[in-house]
Amino acid sequence: GFEFIHVMAGGPDLNILTCDFDSEDLPLPLNFTRNARQSGSLLHSMSDPLYKALSVEYLTQNEHKCGVPTSAYDDSSSKISTFFDIKATNVDRNGKPFVSLVEGKLYPVYGMQAHPEKSNFEWVTSEKYPIPHTIHAMEMSQYFANFFVNECRRNSQTLKNETSALMYNYNPTY
């Protein structure tokens, strides 16, 4: 999703994504930008203790080879730079910087390269899969889930026939 919204917002620029990041199975703290909380709504209501924890503790679970290098935002007049504000970045195991958290400047579009849901829903514990399960990791996961649901509630669109759209009407194939 994160990579897709960058490609969609960036237009035909194929240099938005690169697939040489070494950040699979890699929990990281977020390197917040200077104005991360001052503009927009994504981080505005986050508690100070959680914000601080996200900046120093290894809470965000990264699972990607492809990503958006920070250099994709170097041209301040590019489509991607005019569409998104970078809220946080990271570096992979080799020191290569990538964009990790964005918020749309004009539209309620948000993206996170990491997987905050893994802390609450994946309980594998091993050196190979070091998913953080600390209280701050759980709070981070819940914060972003609550934020997303609250943003969805702002949409006044409704289904004409809600029953026909329920997941129970579809037979999953495994």
Q: What function would you assign to each model-found segment?
A:
Residues 1-7:
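Glycine-rich nucleophile elbow surrounding the catalytic serine of serine-hydrolase chemistry
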Residues 10-174:
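Amide-donor transfer/coupling interface in amidating biosynthetic enzymes
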